[in-house]
Curated annotation (Swiss-Prot):
It catalyses: Release of any N-terminal amino acid, including proline, that is linked to proline, even from a dipeptide or tripeptide. Its cofactor is Mn(2+). Catalyzes the removal of a penultimate prolyl residue from the N-termini of peptides. Mn(2+) 1 binds at D427, E525, E539. Mn(2+) 2 binds at D416, D427, E539. Keywords: Aminopeptidase, Hydrolase, Manganese, Metal-binding, Metalloprotease, Protease. It comes from the Eukaryota. InterPro entries: Creatin/AminoP/Spt16_N, Creatinase/aminopeptidase-like, Creatinase_N, Pept_M24, Pept_M24B, Peptidase_M24_C, Peptidase_M24B_aminopep-P_CS, X-Pro_aminopeptidase_P. Belongs to the peptidase M24B family. It comes from Tuber melanosporum (strain Mel28) (Perigord black truffle). This is Probable Xaa-Pro aminopeptidase P. GO terms for molecular function: metal ion binding; metalloaminopeptidase activity. One of its GO terms (cellular component) is cytoplasm.
């Protein structure tokens, strides 16, 4: 991980800030669609700060520059930021949030600026309130992104790749039925229309996929759904005859950038009593519906706070609960993916013990090569985290060719990887050791494993959130005074983004807002990290399902989890003496299931077959 000299970039930005009469400039990580993962052209925060992690916010004044990020990236940010930057370690005691830091810098009547397309309306409203409480003047939406001006001709071009139709045998539901579900929400709210701006929601809604953002099968677009019409805002050059036929005459196609002008016009017509249609919602004066992730710019175009109602997207909520076709596809692709990981780990162990020098990138490339032979493979779902020894302590470590470590067979190796398949998306982490682990490594691994098992075995009543379950995964680490600085679980899309909401398992308060429901796929990934020494993480994907219980208190159904990931744990790192009989039974049962579902992919006496049999032998 190299450090970038940001001195000249900051100097240019500060000159532009003077031109715009902005004292504090905010640079979020997200793009205009509030995407967690972005294309190279939208990596503005990374460009100005040098920090390449997926989460964080940069703030620049005439005298200071600060980067705020969460615990997943403390080590990485410390390595990548140069001397121009102050690192704000989000969540630590006495460390301000980026919003608090902005408000502090705005004291004394200063102006704060931001590109209104890359901050949500809710974030902008909250930030402006903080600024004014501290004596700042206002939050300004700057029309042109100042980072783009600093970047100039070196800024990468925005992708404009073709879109593909996802067959119903993978999606499980015709897209007009999905749109009708949105219209029911409009009817319930007496709303004249809903703007869909999240890229994965649009891809899911129309049963389309793309390649505009690496590892995420999405495409740049917006959608607008009214009680009578559906409009997709997209560059028409992305659509071939098959896609156009798939959408049919019921979907109007408009240029991508015209969304702002057209919804502004619709908003003006509605304001003066000339709605687009004769819909009852328009007559009743209902508000436009926007999701809580809609940009400030879009919200302002619709008329601002008085004209919009911010809701959790009904598309996001329906997408999170997989239908029967999606559930079966996710299970199948995880079995194939598990077989690929077994083949990879068997190969890696054999090569390392023979003395072959393999670096982290070479190993990751080999894993991708093995995966690519699998049925329905469409690419990776994120950059493979292939990390040896102390690099494994960097939670979202990204090895780079020519600047990475050779895998040490005497050290821990952490591999967090996933793939995109037509029938689903995978994300699996395994921590291995090819030599003799230390007592601390074995104890740490076993404590993490115990937490993962506890969450996997949980049974809970309807209405329970991931916030309530998070302690199950941390309890054994906490009992030793240990912990990890990341969430325990995130939602997973079906041939879509590897991270999806609106639910999750973790300590963030927003995880208390959405209950876990049958059909949701979520990761179970506790970990432990010793800076400069080693890192441990174990991750399975699990599916929420209804379970039978001997009683039903409150006449509520009870839920549990079904195991989806099929990859052995590392026997060498398990201290069996720390496991209870119930945990040992769980482990042996899981390994029996892994063997049963994946051994058929290998020749009887192959390297992978022998490795699988050894690693799944009961303890």
């Amino acid at each position: 991980m190299e450090t970038v000299d940001t001195t000249s970039r900051l100097a240019k930005l500060r000159e532009l800030m003077k031109r715009e009469r902005v004292d504090v400039y905010v640079v979020p990580s997200e793009d205009a669609h509030s995407s967690e993962y972005i294309c190279a052209a939208d990596a503005r925060r990374a460009f100005i700060s040098g920090f390449t992690g997926s989460a964080g916010c940069a703030i620049v004044t005439q005298e200071k520059a600060a980067l705020s990020t969460d615990g997943r990236y403390f080590n990485q940010a410390a390595r990548q930021l140069d001397e121009n930057w102050e690192l704000l370690k989000q969540g630590l005691p006495d460390v301000p949030t980026w919003q608090e830091w902005v408000a502090q810098q705005a004291e004394g009547g200063k102006n704060v600026g931001v590109d209104a397309t890359v901050i949500t309306a809710q974030q902008a409203k909250s930030l402006e309130t903080r600024i004014k409480k501290k004596g700042g003047t206002s939050l300004l939406g700057i029309p042109n992104n100042l980072i783009d001006e600093v970047w100039g001709a070196d800024r990468p071009n925005r992708p404009n790749n073709p879109v593909m139709v996802l067959d119903e045998k993978y999606s499980g539901k015709e897209f007009p039925l999905k749109i009708e579900a949105v219209r029911k929400e409009l009817e319930n709210k007496k709303s004249p229309g809903f703007v869909v701006s999240m890229l994965d929601e649009i891809a899911w809604l129309f049963n389309l996929r793309g390649t505009d953002i690496p590892y995420n099968p999405v495409f740049f677009s917006y959608a607008f759904i009214s009680p009578e019409s559906t409009t997709l805002y997209i560059d028409s050059s992305k659509l071939d005859e098959k896609v156009i036929a798939h959408l049919g005459s019921a979907v109007k196609i408009r240029p991508y950038h015209e969304i702002f002008d057209e919804i502004d016009l619709l908003a003006q017509k509605l304001k003066v009593g000339q709605p687009e249609t004769d819909s009852k919602a328009s007559e009743d004066g209902g508000k436009w519906l926007v999701s809580n992730k809609t940009s400030w710019a879009l919200s302002k175009a619709l008329g601002g706070d008085d004209a919009i109602e911010v809701i959790r997207s009904p598309v996001e909520e329906e997408k999170a609960v997989k239908n029967d076709t999606e559930k079966e596809g996710m299970k199948r692709c995880h079995i194939r993916d598990g077989a690929a990981l077994t083949e990879y780990f068997a190969w890696l162990e054999d090569e390392l013990l023979k003395g072959t020098k393999i670096d982290e990138v070479q190993a990751a490339d080999k894993l991708e090569q093995i995966r690519s032979r699998g049925e329905n493979f469409m690419g990776l779902s994120f950059d493979t985290i292939s990390s040896t020894g102390p690099n494994a302590a960097v939670i979202h470590y990204k090895p780079e060719a020519g600047n990475c470590s050779v895998i040490d067979p005497k050290a821990i190796y952490l591999c967090d990887s996933g793939a995109q398949y037509l029938d689903g998306t995978t994300d699996t982490t395994r921590t291995l050791h090819f030599g003799e682990p230390t007592d601390m490594e074995r104890k740490s691994y076993t404590l993490v494993l115990k937490g993962m098992i506890a969450l996997d075995r949980a049974i809970f009543p309807k209405g329970t959130s991931g916030f309530a379950l998070d302690i199950l995964a941390r309890q054994f680490l906490w009992s030793e005074g240990l912990d990890y600085r990341h969430g325990t679980g995130h939602g997973v899309g079906s041939f879509l983004n590897v991270h999806e909401g609106p639910f999750g398992i973790g300590t963030r308060i927003q995880y208390s807002e959405v209950a876990l429901s049958p059909g949701m796929f979520v990761s179970n990934e506790p970990g432990y990290y010793e800076d400069g020494s080693f890192g441990i993480r174990i991750e399975n994907i699990i599916m929420v399902k209804e379970v039978k219980t001997s009683h039903s208190f409150g006449d509520r159904p009870y839920f549990g989890f079904e195991r989806v990931t099929m990859v052995p744990m590392c026997r060498k790192l398990i201290d069996a003496g720390l496991l209870t009989p119930a945990e040992t039974e769980w482990l042996n049962s899981y390994h029996a299931e892994v063997f049963e579902k994946t051994h058929g992919f290998f020749e009887k006496d192959s390297l992978a077959s022998k490795w699988l049999k050894r690693e799944t032998t009961p303890i």
